[in-house]
Amino acid sequence: MAKLLMTIGSLLVLSLPTAASDKVAAEVLNFSEMDRWVRVTDMICGTVLWEENLEAQRRLPVELCSGDDGKAKIQLYIRIGCTRNKTIVKDGVENGATIQF
């Protein structure tokens, strides 16, 4: 009886969906020829990962929380000038992805 309960318990644990604490490794790439101030936000965990200048052509490795589908969502807020700012939201980010701006 105890063995049966342990087997059922193990199967239940293994059948649970992946938790949001799983991470997706990705890169943010400043493809521009100029340094840019950028705020990188993990939209699933709601945390700001970077909030300062990112040099031209620099790659910034980030670890993002994944959702139930195993994919991440990221937001980039880029200051381009006094009045020209840009917000980029990428949904469905997979492991190894490069998000460029």
Show where each model-derived region lies.
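Short beta-strand/loop motifs in extracellular/secreted proteins, especially
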Residues: 34-39, 72
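Asparagine-centered strand-capping/turn motif at beta-strand->loop junctions
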Residues: 26-34
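Short amphipathic beta-strand segments in non-cytosolic proteins
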Residues: 39-50
